[in-house]
């Protein structure tokens, strides 16, 4: 695995949603590095990728309330454990659970294993509220998928907050989730 600058030189065979991700980043003047790899479905499978990226690798979780009327995309450092009750209390929501794959595809054009903050570029009607754990913001860089799980990106955290999220029209809410005991 090798870290490359920017989009692939040859995008043939790549999915349109991946190419749209590169188009967005390029249009914003965001510098990024990319690594191509086998499908990474779990945080454990991302260990070797993490080493090459040298960035805060985030778990990106699509959550919803019991009625499936409120949806949240949570960015949390990979080493933290997600506790539903803690987050629910912080955001004043009823009990949260993982959203079904149908909502990932409908709102973010993403499938399980590929959930990424960059999928918010497809949420034109703002069905999903972005939640970012404050520890994500402490690193200079963070890693995420370009809406597919066979590549990973290394982006500046400042670019996420100052360029990417504003361009997608979402307002993040910062949360503070404790390390598991």
Where are these regions (language model features)?
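Extended, low-hydrophobicity, polar/charged segments
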Residues: 1-181
């Amino acid at each position: 695995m090798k870290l490359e600058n920017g989009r692939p030189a040859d995008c043939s065979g790549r999915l349109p949603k991946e190419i749209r991700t590169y188009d967005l980043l390029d249009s914003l003047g965001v510098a990024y590095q990319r690594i191509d790899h086998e499908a990474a479905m779990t945080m454990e499978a991302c260990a070797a990728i993490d080493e090459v990226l040298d960035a805060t690798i985030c778990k990106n979780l699509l959550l919803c309330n019991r009625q499936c009327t409120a949806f949240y995309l949570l960015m949390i450092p990979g080493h933290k454990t997600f506790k539903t009750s803690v987050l629910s209390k912080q955001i004043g929501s009823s009990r949260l659970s993982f959203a079904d794959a149908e909502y990932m595809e409908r709102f973010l054009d993403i499938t399980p294993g590929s959930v990424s903050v960059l999928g918010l570029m497809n949420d034109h009607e703002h069905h999903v509220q972005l939640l970012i754990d404050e520890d994500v913001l402490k690193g200079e860089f963070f890693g995420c998928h370009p809406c597919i799980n066979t590549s990973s990106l290394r982006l500046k955290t400042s670019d996420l907050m100052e360029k990417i999220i504003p361009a997608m029209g979402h307002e993040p809410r910062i949360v503070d989730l404790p390390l598991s005991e």
